[in-house]
Amino acid sequence: LIFGLCAATIVCLLPSSPGYLTQQNSIAIEGVDNLLIRSLLDNNQFHDPLDEALNLGISSATWPLFGLLWPSGQHMAQRMAQRPVSVERILEIGCGLGLASLVAHRRGASVTASDCHPLAHAFLDENTRLNGLPPMAYCHGLWGKPALREDGLPVLTSARDAAPSGLFDLIMGSDILYERDDEGTLASFIHAHAASRSEIWVVDPNRGNRAAFHKQMAQLGFARHEQVLNHPAHKGIAAYKGRMLTYTRS
């Protein structure tokens, strides 16, 4: 298992820039060519002048998380690099920068990336352009949102992008079990968009919410396979511990 960052180039904020700092990195994924990925410089970035994120229930603290490269996302990208390309429809939920989707897209898979952040689509378009790829399908994917904004006012507006349409043979998501979901909104969202015969991939960095999600998925007819991920630090790449969760329904 090999992935990491190569030849990072910082893109400095200029007067004409959109109001946040970004960086560009060459991401190495074993078995496929490196990907150029533009991401936020760090988790201190914030720019929501029209309250688009605020109106979707995204707080200033969570605003930058979509635009960072996360270890779980790199593990998912590595998994996608090894999957044979077929005629299946693939949906990535909570895609953030969409690294796994970009790997699949470049290999010729039929993949749709989705996220709830108002800038995720723009970053995905920029990263497809940086890698000389044709446009990738994108949709707004939100499986639950708070009733109130960070400032206490009601969440009012809807997203600019359409919701996922049709059913998918493979649905994947990395680090999506980050909060309690007693009502099972994530499992219900997956169920609504999964084909009758489908596979679900979740990379989870041991967030602690797996047990409830397992139960919710089982109630929807999904069988589970769990693989322990325990990779020591290697050549500048941080150690990683988590689970690769595979749910199948046939």
Task: Describe each model-derived feature in a short phrase.
Residues 3-250:
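S-adenosylmethionine-dependent methyltransferases
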